[in-house]
């Protein structure tokens, strides 16, 4: 009796693993196994992309309030330390 249970359990495990492996490979249209595309299909898709890309002029943004980086770091550190001290008091 225990041998039959073992065989049934092993068969169930094999079926579960095999069904997982069967559905694990996904092939899309135009793809070969492993996700490799054919060279011809890639050349066609690149031919559709325009060769020239127009770049817009970059806008230089400035902050209206001049701040020093060191003061920003100092303020952030002070805020963090105040939070740590408040936690220690609780």
From Swiss-Prot:
Pfam families: GnRH. Residues 1-24 form the signal peptide. One of its GO terms (biological process) is hormone-mediated signaling pathway. One of its GO terms (molecular function) is gonadotropin hormone-releasing hormone activity. PROSITE patterns: GNRH (PS00473). The modification Pyrrolidone carboxylic acid is found at residue 25. The keyword Transmembrane does not apply. The modification Glycine amide is found at residue 34. GO terms for cellular component: extracellular space. It comes from the Eukaryota. InterPro entries: GnRH, Gonadoliberin, Gonadoliberin_I_precursor. Keywords: Amidation, Cleavage on pair of basic residues, Hormone, Pyrrolidone carboxylic acid, Secreted, Signal. Coiled coil: none annotated. Forebrain. It is found in: Secreted. The keyword Secreted applies. Belongs to the GnRH family. PANTHER family: GONADOLIBERIN, PREPROGONADOTROPIN-RELEASING HORMONE 2. Stimulates the secretion of gonadotropins. This is Progonadoliberin-1. It comes from Aquarana catesbeiana (American bullfrog). The gene is gnrh1.
